Amino acid sequence: MIPGEYVLRPEPVTANAGRDAIELSVTNTGDRPVQVGSHFHFAEANAALDFDRAAARGRRLDIPAGTAARFEPGDSRSVRLIELAGSREVFGLSNAVNGKLDGGPHPGVPATERGAK
């Protein structure tokens, strides 16, 4: 082995295998492009994006880590969302959750009160 050498398996690695996924239609109703990162809690995405936010709660984009989806003004397309894993706690972002996603009260500001469609 050469120092620093990587020895990889010949089989391909499948990201997010076995994770529950849904497809949602998303439309950018705004006048500016919107980008959403790979691990952003999708339900809290920019208010100009029109989609079923209740269905997106606790989910993120099913895209490679470190990448983003870009929605141009008037752009409408389908996205695949998977469940957030780990402790399932969300803090900051748009202040809609600020705590655990599962169980307990949800003290954050509802998306509709932040101007979301």
UniProtKB/Swiss-Prot annotation:
It catalyses: urea + 2 H2O + H(+) = hydrogencarbonate + 2 NH4(+). SUPFAM superfamilies: Urease, beta-subunit. Residues 95-117 are annotated as: Disordered. One of its GO terms (molecular function) is urease activity. Its EC number is 3.5.1.5. Transmembrane segments: none annotated. GO terms for biological process: urea catabolic process. It is an enzyme of class 3 (hydrolase). Pfam families: Urease_beta. Pathway: Nitrogen metabolism; urea degradation; CO(2) and NH(3) from urea (urease route): step 1/1. It is found in: Cytoplasm. Its main location: cytoplasm. One of its GO terms (cellular component) is urease complex. Keywords: Cytoplasm, Hydrolase. Heterotrimer of UreA (gamma), UreB (beta) and UreC (alpha) subunits. Three heterotrimers associate to form the active enzyme. Belongs to the urease beta subunit family. This is Urease subunit beta. It comes from Pseudarthrobacter chlorophenolicus (strain ATCC 700700 / DSM 12829 / CIP 107037 / JCM 12360 / KCTC 9906 / NCIMB 13794 / A6) (Arthrobacter chlorophenolicus). The lineage of its organism: Bacteria, Bacillati, Actinomycetota, Actinomycetes, Micrococcales.
